[in-house]
Amino acid sequence: MADFVAAIDQGTTSTRCMIFDHDGAEVGRHQLEHEQILPRAGWVEHNPVEIWERTGSVLATALNKTKLSTSDLVALGITNQRETSLVWNRHTGRPYYNAIVWQDTRTDRIASALDRDGRGDVIRQKAGLPPATYFSGGKLQWLLENVDGLRADAEKGDALFGTTDTWVLWNLTGGHRGGVHVTDVTNASRTMLMNLETLDWDDELLGFFDIPRQMLPEIRPSSSPEPHGVTVDWGPADGEIPVTGILGDQQAAMVGQVCLDAGEAKNTYGTGNFLLLNTGENIVRSKNGLLTTVCYQFGDAKPVYALEGSIAVTGSAVQWLRDQLGIISGAAQSESLARQVEDNGGVYFVPAFSGLFAPYWRSDARGAIVGLSRFNTNAHVARATLEAICYQSRDVVDAMAADSGVHLEVLKVDGGITANDLCMQIQADVLGVDVVRPVVAETTALGAAYAAGLAVGFWDGADDLRANWQEDKRWSPTWSDDQRAAGYAGWRKAVQRTMDWVDVD
């Protein structure tokens, strides 16, 4: 039997391929960044052709670096930036337009109109999502309304829609020469178009956005012994690999963190923050600004659901300090600079660059640094940036407790910012609970590998995955209750200052 599982992680800023053994240990990887296209304020795009070329390259190079071939891989999993949307021609494979990224806010008027006329309540009930620029439905409506010839091609069945998992899979399995047009339940649950109960595209929701059903991919389980597709032997893998796992990136991180029981939660720190709480087979409809989403579905088992708090700007706020303000030269310097001060000096930074996501959902908000005096330095701004990451997570944790009745005792964390010890200590202090990082921090790719490997029996079940999970580091709270309350009160005041800044009606 082959000894390894590979995962493609198609992310917001880069695409990587990682290869894992049965212990869940990484044996090889390759990663390439892709361009962030910013044509105007609030617009964020990716070049789909570049993404596919990067995907093929990282897969081929990871195999080459590890001196493995496709015969050494039992399966391939795909995980991806969710909501990012594109449309391409089924006959030529050419995209009609750049991919519109999840951070993009060009659809704010579409989202606002949904709430004004009552359609938003139907979307919340059926799809578990509030109308927002974040999700795919509005992006696809915008493409159909603004790209010449697209609607006519869509109605003829010539145009295909997908999130980036679907685009990557279609190309891996042959593209216009027979590629499969498939997504999984987790990605479909982020479109505002899928019914959470039926796990199928909902005709009423499609009608809200005037979307032809024939554009949409088939929805399948996240992990399936019947492959979603098989890589073509003339493609970048240079051989056939069954693709048996697909998960949106945050759901993949839940699986990688082995949060498989109701009440378990993880927080992924990347471009944005994404905090998910497993709610088991129960659909918990949020009354506190969270998303209800599919966590995963393995084979023909019932789906497992989650509550999610999606935060648009966390790691990218640190990038902003580097790229726009120039006060740090790299992400690691944010920690050393912030350590020069004992506290934030009264400064709060709310990085609402594209509005506020969970639990506020205010597209009229914009970023603000408040509380400045002549006493403050760039170190206070760096500290406030790290605190902003943690306070936004506190907003979500409190909303989860209100919705579910679950009060966390420990928070599992992963993603790039977890290498920042100061940020993780602040997170423990702000929440008042232990924060724990696993040995394998790349849990998104690992979760996709787990989904693929479970489908073919490489791992027998959840107990195998739990045995693989190991704690690397733990941070415990050091703040008093009074410190915690005072800090959070200042944060809530700062958040209010960012709202009603731009007109979205």
UniProtKB/Swiss-Prot annotation:
Gene3D superfamilies linked: 3.30.420.40
EC number: 2.7.1.30
Record entry for activity regulation: Inhibited by fructose 1,6-bisphosphate (FBP).
Catalytic activity: glycerol + ATP = sn-glycerol 3-phosphate + ADP + H(+)
Any one Gene Ontology BP term: glycerol catabolic process
Top-level enzyme category: transferase
Residues the entry annotates as binding glycerol: 82-83, 134, 249-250
Annotated sn-glycerol 3-phosphate binding sites: 12, 82-83, 134, 249
Keywords: ATP-binding, Glycerol metabolism, Kinase, Nucleotide-binding, Transferase
Pfam families: FGGY_C, FGGY_N
MF (Gene Ontology): ATP binding; glycerol kinase activity
Signal peptide limits: none
HAMAP family: Glycerol_kin
Function: Key enzyme in the regulation of glycerol uptake and metabolism. Catalyzes the phosphorylation of glycerol to yield sn-glycerol 3-phosphate.
Protein name: Glycerol kinase
